[in-house]
């Protein structure tokens, strides 16, 4: 029983390291924030695998969660940290969608562009209603969040490359 408890002890939320804070803050700056709005409540779940999950847990809930013997998740899932850095979650996309345009950088797609994006395909030209360069929240023609992408321009052609889209749940996320 003691070995089992020790194995489960890794499922505890902890404060982020300075490196983890920098990765999340770097992403938030890239999409338009001047400061990290989640800095005071960021927590990390590091079960020892390839990825660490990053959550925002308001201070009012922190004491209640700390009393629990096991943490799987708590609060708003901001994303994960892996070998390639910080990867924002779809939960964060939904949370930030109302801030599209100010301060959050957004790319808006046409209905056809939405379909391409949700199949994790690059979106080009007329399928992009509004474009910005770099990492951005991608929304549909109705303003609903579709995921995260990168806006590019090559030889005058606008391109959106998906980073994570809602279709991911059907393809890989289970």
Curated annotation (Swiss-Prot):
A family per Pfam: UPF0113
InterPro entries xref list: NIP7_N, PUA_sf, UPF0113_PUA
Molecular function terms, GO-annotated: RNA binding
Family of the protein in this entry: Belongs to the UPF0113 family.
Protein name: UPF0113 protein APE_0516.1
Native source organism of the sequence: Aeropyrum pernix (strain ATCC 700893 / DSM 11879 / JCM 9820 / NBRC 100138 / K1)
